């Protein structure tokens, strides 16, 4: 009888394999990086220098992934995670390392990935931008599940849709963390508990805000219960159904958030993007002003400007600043806010920044550019951006791999990486943000 090769059984055999590893670094996603038989293996939950027995969970031609079965040696700085939910909650990945060690490892990962993908080394490393280690997050989404007569509020488990029930969160701003248990107690007895999709919690200048994602219309007794809760706790309660409304069914007025030093506050609505770490965001804005050094008479572009986080702060620094955003509603909100504040030197324009260069007059004679793209970076922007020949390009990156790829394009167009700095926006997580300043000059062009 013929015997046929089974790729599936071979793969299963390899995935059951147990091996011993000692990683040498963390990558930019917070995974330990080790080598086994010439192949790179990524292992969450380990620190460089620790030894562990692991099991492969994915085995590709060029790399593998593994899970820890047992640590056989610990890093001298390893600590017990302070949060009791850490082992199950997917929100944090690095609580077993002190924040100082986390930052050192993140900076090493940032340097490695930028150098690898762009061929660039910064002329100057900036000091990391830091904020509080705990209670820094001013926005979060709580998942809701009604199961066996019980309402569960919590965060998703790592790599899963399952919820981990929590009663507090040490990285969430205290006014928001303190609402978790009372919200569970408020909603659980109500019939609407079965119809809540999630809760969005945010801390605005106006105070705490809770948005209830409701999958059916709100009933009068439920409205009264939510209103009483909001009034007693100083919380603005909103409903997200087919539209975002207050409890009376009216449209919601824009909220605001502080960007420090008496600067004009951007306006936003729940659902808009804004930086979740207020202290570090203010530090980023101050560093942007310091690095760009906008001068009277200059013209600047703020690409991917959102509601004007940087644009409003830069108001008055240059003769003309143009914020460019691809979400029409946010453009309209930013325009209205600038008009409300009387900031005539600011303009906000809509443009699809993932495609060809906009054919617009405002692209001419640009002196400096700030861009703050999403994790995918700005591949559609880099070629035409470099052709504008601004004297300073400040790239705010939430993904170092995108920064490295986009930085390579700038390098090929004759820009050098003059400054690079870590931005520790999310302590205890694998998220790694950075700021990079590119200026014209001699540079080793990547091949």
From Swiss-Prot:
Keywords: 4Fe-4S, Iron, Iron-sulfur, Metal-binding, Methyltransferase, rRNA processing, S-adenosyl-L-methionine, Transferase. It is an enzyme of class 2 (transferase). One of its GO terms (biological process) is rRNA base methylation. Residues 12-70 form the TRAM domain. Pfam families: TRAM, tRNA_U5-meth_tr. InterPro entries: 23S_rRNA_MeTrfase_RlmD, MeTrfase_TrmA_AS, MeTrfase_TrmA_CS, NA-bd_OB-fold, SAM-dependent_MTases_sf, TRAM_dom, U5_MeTrfase_fam. [4Fe-4S] cluster binds at residues 83, 89, 92, 169. The active site is at 398 (nucleophile). One of its GO terms (molecular function) is rRNA (uridine-C5-)-methyltransferase activity. S-adenosyl-L-methionine binds at residues 275, 304, 309, 325, 352, 372. It catalyses: uridine(1939) in 23S rRNA + S-adenosyl-L-methionine = 5-methyluridine(1939) in 23S rRNA + S-adenosyl-L-homocysteine + H(+). Its EC number is 2.1.1.190. Catalyzes the formation of 5-methyl-uridine at position 1939 (m5U1939) in 23S rRNA. Belongs to the class I-like SAM-binding methyltransferase superfamily. RNA M5U methyltransferase family. RlmD subfamily. HAMAP family: 23SrRNA_methyltr_RlmD. This is 23S rRNA (uracil(1939)-C(5))-methyltransferase RlmD. It comes from Ferrimonas balearica (strain DSM 9799 / CCM 4581 / KCTC 23876 / PAT).
């Amino acid at each position: 009888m013929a015997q046929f090769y089974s790729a599936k059984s071979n793969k299963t055999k390899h995935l059951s394999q147990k091996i011993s590893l000692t990683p040498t670094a963390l990558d930019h996603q917070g995974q330990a990086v080790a080598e086994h038989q010439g192949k790179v293996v990524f292992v969450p939950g380990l620190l460089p220098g620790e030894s562990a027995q692991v099991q492969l969970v994915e085995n590709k031609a060029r790399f593998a992934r593994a899970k820890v079965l047992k640590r056989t040696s610990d890093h001298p700085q390893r600590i017990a995670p302070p949060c009791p939910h850490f082992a199950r909650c997917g929100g944090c990945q690095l609580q077993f390392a002190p924040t100082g060690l986390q930052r050192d490892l993140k900076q090493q990962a940032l340097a490695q990935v930028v150098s690898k993908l762009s061929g660039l080394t910064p002329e100057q490393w900036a000091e990391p931008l830091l904020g509080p280690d705990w209670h820094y997050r001013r926005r979060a989404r709580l998942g809701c599940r009604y199961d066996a007569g019980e309402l569960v509020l919590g965060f998703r488990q790592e790599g899963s849709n399952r919820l981990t029930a929590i009663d507090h969160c040490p990285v969430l701003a205290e006014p928001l963390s303190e609402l978790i248990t009372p919200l569970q107690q408020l909603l659980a007895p109500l019939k609407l508990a079965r119809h809540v999709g999630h809760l969005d919690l945010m801390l605005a200048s106006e105070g705490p805000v809770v948005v209830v994602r409701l999958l059916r219309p709100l009933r009068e007794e439920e409205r009264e219960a939510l209103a009483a809760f909001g009034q007693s706790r100083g919380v603005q309660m909103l409903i997200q159904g087919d539209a975002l409304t207050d409890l009376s069914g009216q449209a919601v007025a824009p909220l605001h958030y502080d960007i420090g030093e008496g600067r004009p506050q951007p306006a936003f609505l729940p659902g808009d993007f804004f930086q979740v770490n207020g202290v570090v965001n203010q530090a980023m804005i101050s560093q942007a002003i310091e690095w760009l050094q906008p001068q009277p008479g200059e013209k600047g572009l703020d690409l991917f400007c959102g509601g004007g986080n940087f644009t409003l702060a830069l108001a008055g620094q240059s003769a003309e600043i143009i914020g460019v955003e691809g979400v029409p509603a946010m453009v309209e909100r930013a325009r209205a806010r600038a008009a409300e504040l009387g900031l005539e030197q600011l303009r906000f324009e809509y443009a699809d920044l993932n495609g060809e260069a906009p054919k617009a007059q405002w692209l001419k004679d640009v002196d400096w550019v700030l861009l703050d793209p999403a994790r995918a970076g700005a591949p559609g922007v880099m070629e035409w951006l470099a052709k504008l020949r601004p004297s300073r390009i400040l790239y705010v990156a939430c993904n170092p791999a995108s920064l490295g790829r986009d930085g390579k394009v700038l390098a090929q167009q004759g820009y050098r990486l003059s400054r690079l700095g870590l931005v520790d926006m999310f302590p205890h997580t694998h998220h790694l943000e950075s700021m990079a300043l590119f200026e014209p000059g001699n540079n080793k062009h990547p091949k």
